[in-house]
Amino acid sequence: MVGMYIIIPIVTFIIGGLLAWLGMRFLLKSKYDSVLQEAEKEAEVIKKNKMLEVKEKFLHLKADLEKQVSQRNAKIQSVETKLKQRELTMNQRQEELQRRNNEVEAVKENLSSQLELVEKKKQDLDKLHQKEVEHLEAISGLSAEEAKERLIESLKDEAKTQAASYINEIVEEAKMTANKEAKKIVIQSIQRVATETAIENSITVFHIESDEIKGRIIGREGRNIRALEAATGIEIVVDDTPEAIVLSGFDPVRREIARLALHQLVQDGRIHPARIEEVVTKVKKQVEDEVVETGKRTVIDLGVHGLHPELIRMIGKMKYRSSYGQNLLQHARETANLCAVMASELGLNPKKAKRAGLLHDIGKVPDDEPELPHAILGMKLCEKYKEKPDICNAVGAHHDEVEMQTLLAPIVQVCDAISGARPGARREIVEAYIKRLNDLEQLALSYPGVVKTYAIQAGRELRVIVGADKIDDKDTENLSAEIAKKIQDEMTYPGQVKITVIRETRAVSYAK
């Protein structure tokens, strides 16, 4: 009995465990089947999606391929059309060439037949001409060559007579027309250029506020006046003229330097030899700058471009030069404008003519090489500073020193004469006076050791400044005598000329 109680629970436990295992297995199998079905469904969906993607890509690729094939077919068709058109054109051209060739052959055959006919007629005419010539020779008693010569001589005489008559008519008409046209051009040129009548003097009047300043300008025992005259080379005349000091000298540049220096000294109030030298040095630089500025303004006003800076400086320096009393810069501007107008009237280049007119008297500016005519010196300067050959020739030929090679040269010559020939434009006595003073200075400068020379008091005194390191005190007297003798032998002058040789030694030190 007890054994039954033990066996029954064990059997029950075993049966329960078996049932539980069977139930678990059933559940697991059901879950497995469910998961398998889900996996199969998902696999089917994925498969369908992939199939759709593949199909879509296939359709896209197919469409692209069909499009490319269509485009290629279109290109092939276009090329085939062009080839057919070209072939048709070539066939038409070939037919046209064949037709023209046939026409040429026909014309050639026709020409050949006509040429044969002409040749035959020519032979007949030659025979007939020969018969006629023989007949005429028999009648006239002259050969054909003799008859030709007589006819040629007769025609020559007749042609010469007619040509001579025709040439005379042309020459007379040209003379009348040329004279009339030349007068017309000159009158038109003068009318179109406005000018002023200006005569350069050899003195400048410096006005002062009161006569008290005269004493300060003169200085103790005249030392300020002497220092100013030595520094500028200008004679300072202080007389009884109220509120005025006269600056006398033939060189306008020196007079302008003296005037500006006096103006600054009077304004500053400090007037003594050291200050005078300082101011004169400063004013010389100022005048040089003004010369360059004047040259630049002149070329800009006239529209002349591309000049060398040294030529521009020389043009500015013309402001302080005169020719027979006529201001050289005004004369050059006037000549340039006249040249431009006359060149325009003659159908030539007015810019080149104006350039040549402006530069024609440039040889009067340099102080060196005085033995050369100013036209030749001007031509050399233009060549040196790379002016064109026609400009150089016009400058050199305007006084007939060289041969005129272009039409610019006679224009410059005529306009120079027109400018100088105006009533009141020039005064030859002034030019002769200035030339005499300049020759006086150049004569003294030719001696070794001479640094500067100044002709003052209308050429009655010549001051010669020598280098202290080159000439001693004993030689100054000999130099003065030699210069005086050379002036007596080589120059013509009124009265007498006083030669003053100045030798000055300076020792300068600075206290620091």
Swiss-Prot record:
HAMAP family listed in its UniProt record: RNase_Y
Annotated compartments: Cell membrane
NCBIfam families per UniProt: HDIG, RNase_Y
Spans through the membrane: 2-22
Annotated ranges, domain HD: 328-421
Family (UniProt): Belongs to the RNase Y family.
Gene (UniProt): rny
Biological classification of the source: Bacteria, Pseudomonadati, Bacteroidota, Bacteroidia, Bacteroidales
PANTHER family from the UniProt entry: RIBONUCLEASE Y
Its membrane topology: Single-pass membrane protein
InterPro entries cross-referenced by the UniProt entry: HD/PDEase_dom (IPR003607), HD_domain (IPR006674), HDIG_dom (IPR006675), KH_dom (IPR004087), KH_dom_type_1 (IPR004088), KH_dom_type_1_sf (IPR036612), Ribonuclease_Y (IPR017705), RNase_Y_N (IPR022711)
GO MF terms, alphabetically ordered: RNA binding; RNA endonuclease activity
Name under which the protein is recorded: Ribonuclease Y
